[in-house]
Amino acid sequence: KEGYLVDLHTGCKYTCVGLGDNDYCVRECRLRYYDSAHGYCYAFGCWCTHLYEQAVVWPLPNKRCK
């Protein structure tokens, strides 16, 4: 599974600059999911890959970014 890293409290994507490989996104994806996850900056949001199927990604059901 893959998808945008989401803040569970606000419902917003984690934003980033520096499109493509991005140390911030790699670190945040691994902190949220696990060490084998990877992340990069895509369309100014952290996109995480190699996630487990139950991983929660953006958009959250019934919660809009404020």
UniProtKB/Swiss-Prot annotation:
Gene Ontology MF: a single term: sodium channel inhibitor activity
Localization (cell): Secreted
InterPro entries: LCN-type_CS_alpha_beta_dom, Scorpion_toxin-like, Scorpion_toxin-like_sf, Scorpion_toxinL
Top-level division of the source organism's lineage: Eukaryota
Keywords: Disulfide bond, Ion channel impairing toxin, Neurotoxin, Secreted, Toxin, Voltage-gated sodium channel impairing toxin
Gene3D superfamilies cross-referenced by the UniProt entry: Knottin, scorpion toxin-like
Record flagged with keyword Disulfide bond: yes
Record-level GO BP terms: defense response; envenomation resulting in negative regulation of voltage-gated sodium channel activity in another organism
Tissue: Expressed by the venom gland.
Gene Ontology cellular component terms for the protein in this record: extracellular space
Primary subcellular site in the record, as a coarse category: secreted
Disulfides per UniProt: 12-65, 16-41, 25-46, 29-48
Domain LCN-type CS-alpha/beta: start-end pairs: 1-66
Family per similarity comment: Belongs to the long (4 C-C) scorpion toxin superfamily. Sodium channel inhibitor family. Beta subfamily.
Domain notes: Has the structural arrangement of an alpha-helix connected to antiparallel beta-sheets by disulfide bonds (CS-alpha/beta).
Function summary: Beta toxins bind voltage-independently at site-4 of sodium channels (Nav) and reduces peak current and shifts the voltage of activation toward more negative potentials thereby affecting sodium channel activation and promoting spontaneous and repetitive firing. Has an inhibitory effect on voltage-gated sodium channel hNav1.6/SCN8A, affecting both the activation and inactivation processes. Also reduces the peak current of hNav1.5/SCN5A but does not shift its voltage of activation. This toxin is active against mammals and lethal to mice.
Entry protein name: Beta-toxin Cb2
Biological source species: Centruroides baergi (Scorpion)
Classification lineage: Eukaryota, Metazoa, Ecdysozoa, Arthropoda, Chelicerata
